[in-house]
């Protein structure tokens, strides 16, 4: 095992020699100083920001979203999210959580495992460092495990700030996009980062990760599907035109799309986005210490936890009243979410029954397209964290169209099934719990958990040891 990862490290070093040949290299910089991805390196000069960032480690609890809503196991059948899907924790846990999820499997060497390198892209400031050193092709190529020892530090300072700039060193924010695919995405929607206002830049740095994206090309590089715009319809049209699918559904065989977390897109369409109230206004407010010092709180969290520093800056209503409004909107979105899920789950099983009854690809094509569109719209709404607050009207409208699309699919399926001699309702197996739903799909969860356990106990310690040695060699001690 040791030799396998050592060889990979040597190969990564050798690859640096080719970085200037990369067609999308991000290595060019006005400052030749090596970027330091270690968040602790900024603790002394930016103590308040660092201490508040470190407080994101307070979110220790892991909440199992599949256990809460087993429908999602079926909706993602055949895809990694059916294995596990936990609600997001604080930035402090970004690297740990992606290592521990069953979705990344249990690779035993640099070439094994189910996921590409791109899965690190929103987890660490080491990503920007590696892209600078090896170019985009050098970073994205290969499996997720290939550069496991290089991605060590969780989401932090160098993800959103130009930490090498004089502005940052003198206490200024020096906001920056640190990944070239994000710069291209902003250009695509006519918002080059350098031309953006300070408020837009505050949202854009969050939009490096809190967005919809997909993996493209031989290297499975990250791309935002914004060529036609950022609405659910525009991105759907884009995906359809290029014939993209994330996976083929295990039950219905539909060519599926998996929305990631389009928070930036839904925020733009919501009341706050339209009024230039940005992510940091609500989630990272400026706070005043007892000595009068003002700083930006980097403990990204619920605005109601710091009501006087967030909501009360604009709203005259009481905290209790606003909490009631948000709770009502959340309940409305949840109700429509579950309605859409029931329809789409049924459509998947009915499509499976149609295949079993001898349906042809030609007969199924329009049905599968309806299922694809229905679930894309459902996912776009539910994967956008906080959409009930950011843009509840968008969520309800999009979920409504998801129900309509699913109903279209089921109407066509009723006719097709009748044509095949099936007039009784299609039976749906027990999916009342996460375990039952995974069993219905024939998933060997114990084997997956054992594989992950072995990976965490054998491979991850080697990654951490190699990262420690590299950082000791490349950076000044803290």
Swiss-Prot record:
Ca(2+) binds at residues 212-213, 258, 260. GO terms for molecular function: calcium ion binding; heme binding; iron ion binding; nitrite reductase (cytochrome, ammonia-forming) activity. Heme c 2 binds at residues 157, 160-161, 298. GO terms for cellular component: outer membrane-bounded periplasmic space. InterPro entries: Cyt_c552, Cyt_c_NO2Rdtase_formate-dep, Multihaem_cyt_sf. Pathway: Nitrogen metabolism; nitrate reduction (assimilation). Heme binds at residues 119, 122-123. Its cofactor is Ca(2+); heme c. Heme c 3 binds at residues 91, 206, 209-210. Catalyzes the reduction of nitrite to ammonia, consuming six electrons in the process. This is Cytochrome c-552. The lineage of its organism: Bacteria, Pseudomonadati, Pseudomonadota, Gammaproteobacteria, Vibrionales.
């Amino acid at each position: 095992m040791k030799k396998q990862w050592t060889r990979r490290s040597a190969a990564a070093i050798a690859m640096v020699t080719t970085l200037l040949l990369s067609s999308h290299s991000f290595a060019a910089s006005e400052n030749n100083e090596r970027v330091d991805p270690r968040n602790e390196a900024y603790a002394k000069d930016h103590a308040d920001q660092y201490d508040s960032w470190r407080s994101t480690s307070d979110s220790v609890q892991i909440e199992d979203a599949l256990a809460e809503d087993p429908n999602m196991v079926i909706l993602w059948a055949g895809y990694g999210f059916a294995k596990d899907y936990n609600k997001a924790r604080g930035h402090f846990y970004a690297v740990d959580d992606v290592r521990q999820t069953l979705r990344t499997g249990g690779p035993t060497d640099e070439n094994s495992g189910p996921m590409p390198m791109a899965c690190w892209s929103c987890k660490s400031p080491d990503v920007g460092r590696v892209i600078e050193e090896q170019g985009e092709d050098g970073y994205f190529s290969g499996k997720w495990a290939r550069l496991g020892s290089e991605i060590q530090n969780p989401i932090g300072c160098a993800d959103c700030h130009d930490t090498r700039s004089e502005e940052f060193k003198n206490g200024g924010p020096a906001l920056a996009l640190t990944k070239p695919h994000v710069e291209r995405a902003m250009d695509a929607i006519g918002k080059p980062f350098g031309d953006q206002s300070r408020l837009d830049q505050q949202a854009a740095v969050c939009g490096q990760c809190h967005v919809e994206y997909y993996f493209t090309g031989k290297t499975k590089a990250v791309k935002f599907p914004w060529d036609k715009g950022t609405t659910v319809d525009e991105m759907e049209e884009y995906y359809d035109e290029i014939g993209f699918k994330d996976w083929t559904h295990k039950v219905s065989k539909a060519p599926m799309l998996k929305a990631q977390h389009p928070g930036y897109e839904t925020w733009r369409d919501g009341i706050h986005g339209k009024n230039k109230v940005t992510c940091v206004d609500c989630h990272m407010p400026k706070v005043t210490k007892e000595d009068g010092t003002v700083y930006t709180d980097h403990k990204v969290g619920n605005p109601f936890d710091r009501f006087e520093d967030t909501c009360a800056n604009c709203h005259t209503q009481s905290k209790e009243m606003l909490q009631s409004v948000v709770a009502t909107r959340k309940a409305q979105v949840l109700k429509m979410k579950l309605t859409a899920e029931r329809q789409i789950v049924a459509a998947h099983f009915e499509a499976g029954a149609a295949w079993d009854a001898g349906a042809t690809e030609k007969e199924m094509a329009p049905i599968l397209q309806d299922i694809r569109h229905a679930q894309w719209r459902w996912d776009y709404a539910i994967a956008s964290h906080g959409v009930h607050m950011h843009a509840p009207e968008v969520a309800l409208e999009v979920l409504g169209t998801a129900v309509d699309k699913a109903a279209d699919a089921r109407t066509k399926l009723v006719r097709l099934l009748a044509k095949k001699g099936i007039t009784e309702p299609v039976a749906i197996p027990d999916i009342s719990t996460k375990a039952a739903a995974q069993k219905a799909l024939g998933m060997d969860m114990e084997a997956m958990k054992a594989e992950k356990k072995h990976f965490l106990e054998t491979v991850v310690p080697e990654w951490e040891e190699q990262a420690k040695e590299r950082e000791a060699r490349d950076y000044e001690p803290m």
